[in-house]
Amino acid sequence: MPADIRIVPCLTDNFGYLVHDPATGATASIDAPEAAPLIAALDKEGWKLTDILVTHHHGDHVGGIAELKKKYQCRVHAPHDANAKIADADVRLQEGDVVRVGDLTARVLETPGHTLDHLSYVFDDDRALFAADTLFSIGCGRVFEGTYPMMWESLLKLRALPDDFKLYCGHEYTASNVKFALGIEPDNAALQARAKQVESLRAEGKPTIPVTLGEEKQANVFLRADVPSVAAAVGMPGAPAAEVFGEIRERKNNG
């Protein structure tokens, strides 16, 4: 049976996610920005939390773990090299591991850059990618701990997934990301279409995710650093893609 996925707004602009297996009743939270909204969503659905899948150690992604674990006695799956930072972890994960949530399965991808321990979770059967702060809609995370080449390789790993996968990211940053991207690719038709869609969704108070990876590949300038016209637009024709990506990320940092 397909997973039931619920988007749970948390904190100021974080997304929490509940992934429920209707066949077994198992439910996973992808990260735990804060406990109260997730508990409310679980209560509304009549679900019990069985697992938390942590993407990285930043406080706005793990702040609710202790309370949720105490309430539900759920298993906490966390990056293998975040041991000292996520003390509540029961299972340590690395590239190629598989997490089972009831009858659902998630592949673990290491996607370092934003942090060195960052993981993304791929639910192949449900065509869902939970990329947290590696890949945003029309954006990507700041590179706090890694390097620009490292982050670019992580983005390439996610870009290689099929177009029909849906992206579930860590924050509602899409409107500001669109504004920035249009400054580099004002004539990108896919980006223009996404901009209109985002404006409409936000006007209705709706989240801008999920979005398909196919759409992101056409409209997200951070995934397009190896496109010659993008390199030219930032004054780096012929430069290596990782360097072009770094320039785009620096512009976003300073914008």
UniProtKB/Swiss-Prot annotation:
<dbReference type="InterPro" id="IPR036866">
    <property type="entry name" value="RibonucZ/Hydroxyglut_hydro"/>
</dbReference>
<dbReference type="InterPro" id="IPR017782">
    <property type="entry name" value="Hydroxyacylglutathione_Hdrlase"/>
</dbReference>
<dbReference type="InterPro" id="IPR050110">
    <property type="entry name" value="Glyoxalase_II_hydrolase"/>
</dbReference>
<comment type="function">
    <text>Thiolesterase that catalyzes the hydrolysis of S-D-lactoyl-glutathione to form glutathione and D-lactic acid.</text>
</comment>
<keyword id="KW-0862">Zinc</keyword>
<feature type="binding site">
    <location>
        <position position="60"/>
    </location>
    <ligand>
        <name>Zn(2+) 2</name>
    </ligand>
</feature>
<feature type="binding site">
    <location>
        <position position="171"/>
    </location>
    <ligand>
        <name>Zn(2+) 2</name>
    </ligand>
</feature>
<feature type="binding site">
    <location>
        <position position="133"/>
    </location>
    <ligand>
        <name>Zn(2+) 2</name>
    </ligand>
</feature>
<feature type="binding site">
    <location>
        <position position="61"/>
    </location>
    <ligand>
        <name>Zn(2+) 2</name>
    </ligand>
</feature>
<keyword id="KW-0479">Metal-binding</keyword>
<dbReference type="Pfam" id="PF00753">
    <property type="entry name" value="Lactamase_B"/>
</dbReference>
<dbReference type="InterPro" id="IPR001279">
    <property type="entry name" value="Metallo-B-lactamas"/>
</dbReference>
<feature type="binding site">
    <location>
        <position position="133"/>
    </location>
    <ligand>
        <name>Zn(2+) 1</name>
    </ligand>
</feature>
<comment type="similarity">
    <text>Belongs to the metallo-beta-lactamase superfamily. Glyoxalase II family.</text>
</comment>
<comment type="subunit">
    <text>Monomer.</text>
</comment>
<dbReference type="InterPro" id="IPR035680">
    <property type="entry name" value="Clx_II_MBL"/>
</dbReference>
<dbReference type="Pfam" id="PF16123">
    <property type="entry name" value="HAGH_C"/>
</dbReference>
<keyword id="KW-0378">Hydrolase</keyword>
<dbReference type="GO" id="GO:0004416">
    <property type="term" value="F:hydroxyacylglutathione hydrolase activity"/>
</dbReference>
<dbReference type="GO" id="GO:0019243">
    <property type="term" value="P:methylglyoxal catabolic process to D-lactate via S-lactoyl-glutathione"/>
</dbReference>
<feature type="binding site">
    <location>
        <position position="56"/>
    </location>
    <ligand>
        <name>Zn(2+) 1</name>
    </ligand>
</feature>
<protein>
    <recommendedName>
        <fullName>Hydroxyacylglutathione hydrolase</fullName>
        <ecNumber>3.1.2.6</ecNumber>
    </recommendedName>
</protein>
<dbReference type="InterPro" id="IPR032282">
    <property type="entry name" value="HAGH_C"/>
</dbReference>
<dbReference type="GO" id="GO:0046872">
    <property type="term" value="F:metal ion binding"/>
</dbReference>
<comment type="pathway">
    <text>Secondary metabolite metabolism; methylglyoxal degradation; (R)-lactate from methylglyoxal: step 2/2.</text>
</comment>
<feature type="binding site">
    <location>
        <position position="114"/>
    </location>
    <ligand>
        <name>Zn(2+) 1</name>
    </ligand>
</feature>
<feature type="binding site">
    <location>
        <position position="58"/>
    </location>
    <ligand>
        <name>Zn(2+) 1</name>
    </ligand>
</feature>
